[in-house]
Amino acid sequence: TGIRNLGSAIIGQPELEIFVIVTHSHWDHIQGFPFFTPIYQPNRPVHMFPTLHKKNVVLASLIDQMDGAHFPITPDQVPSNFNFVTENPLEFLESNGFHLEMVPMNHPGKAFGYKITIEDKIICYFTDNEIDPPYAKSIELDKLTEQCRNADILIHDAQYIETDMPLKHGWGHSLISQVTELGKAAEVKNLVYYHHDPERSDDDIDAELEKASKVLKEKDSSVIPYFAYEGLRLTL
């Protein structure tokens, strides 16, 4: 849903091409798309990737919500140039300077994280992942750790704390403490805790950042922790 603010930030750069790659089709990950203002700019190139998840399911979720009943503007009224990349999407991204690897996440309904390499920088975007779920795992912790080994940035789901359990065990999200251990074990450079529980206040989040920083310092880790907030920018 943060894509709305991103749209406002780049609306004055019509030359930028946009690549839309979605992790999964749960509401909180698709609802912002109709409010993404660049899609209302005539001739703005927008590349959509329907086959990186279940074929056409995520694309349908993005587009079908703009049906006139749930949103007043329908897809045929959108003036930007949608390019639905259905053939060799990974090769298409490679030709545009992005090496992208799909990584299965542990999440109800299935989801994918993405490991993106641009030049010599590695960014792992692992949202909606339950590190230790009660259901069958799509990825084991050792494999997850290797996927983000030495990443410049790891952005990882960190919605819960120990007091949320056992009620929310199996809901598809990780404990903050688990993410701290993952970042340390993988020796990532920057660790961004993401997907905060909406019930947590800014003070709560600041307190969790202080705890995570203390744990990493006590274990002599060089990982730099951040708790994501709107407008956060990291320069590599």
Cite the ranges covered by each PLM segment.
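Thr-Gly-centered strand-to-loop micro-motif
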Residues: F126-T127, H156
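A broadly conserved detector of short glycine/acidic/proline-rich loop/turn motifs that flank catalytic sites
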Residues: N129, Y160, G231
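Active-site glycine-centered loops adjacent to acidic/histidine catalytic or metal-binding residues
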Residues: H24, D128, H195
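Binuclear metal-dependent hydrolase catalytic cores
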Residues: T1-C124, D132-Y135, T145, I205-L236
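Cap/insert and terminal regions of metallo-dependent hydrolase folds
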Residues: P133-I224
